[in-house]
Curated annotation (Swiss-Prot):
GO CC terms: mediator complex
Keyword annotations from UniProtKB, A to Z: Activator, Developmental protein, Nucleus, Transcription, Transcription regulation
Gene this protein is translated from: mdt-19
Domain of life (superkingdom): Eukaryota
UniProt organism field: Caenorhabditis elegans
Segments of skewed composition (Basic residues): 164-178
Region listing for Disordered, in residue ranges: 155-199
UniProt family annotation: Belongs to the Mediator complex subunit 19 family.
Function noted in UniProt: Component of the Mediator complex, a coactivator involved in the regulated transcription of nearly all RNA polymerase II-dependent genes. Mediator functions as a bridge to convey information from gene-specific regulatory proteins to the basal RNA polymerase II transcription machinery. Mediator is recruited to promoters by direct interactions with regulatory proteins and serves as a scaffold for the assembly of a functional preinitiation complex with RNA polymerase II and the general transcription factors.
Protein name: Mediator of RNA polymerase II transcription subunit 19
Amino acid sequence: MNEPSACSGPPVKSKSSKNEPFYTLKALLPPYSEIQGNHDLLMSYELGPVEGGFSGSRRVKEKISSFLPHIIGEFHLDATKEASSLRALIEKPPIHKEISNLTSSSMQGFKLSAGPVDERYRHLFERRKEEPNLAYSEKLNLIRVRQQYDAYGFDDDETEKGFPKKHKKKKKDKKRKKEKEELGDAEKRKRAADEPMEF
């Protein structure tokens, strides 16, 4: 029995891509094939009638909404029936008159007048008295939720919350004092080195 050798297979090309004349252009032309670019594969495999059934002039019975069941409402609209085309918007604009400014008498309807708050909106302003967690701002005329005060900080983890803030402050003060002393000693040594030695 002839066992297949480890190097069996198609011969490996020793030509590198550097020897090719241009990028993606090989020295040899591709081999001749009966199937060319202008060859109709649908007709050769007798699939012409199947393709004509999908893309022919026959009207499709199903609407777009049948393929998109998750969209609510009727969105299969005909532009010719609804007259919602761009040409109809240009030829027949919806505004036929000139836009004019409102008169002073017409603007009186938009003017705010001082008076008691309507009963429908009175509960918005009475909420701040009932709930202590709400803070009212007169400047901005709004009600915002006041955050609960935490003596140990909002972002501290549980291990840090076990120690009071005073303990942390003492540690920081000691550290700063030690750093100042070290800086003072370093300055003294520098001055002593810069001074000329007397004999």
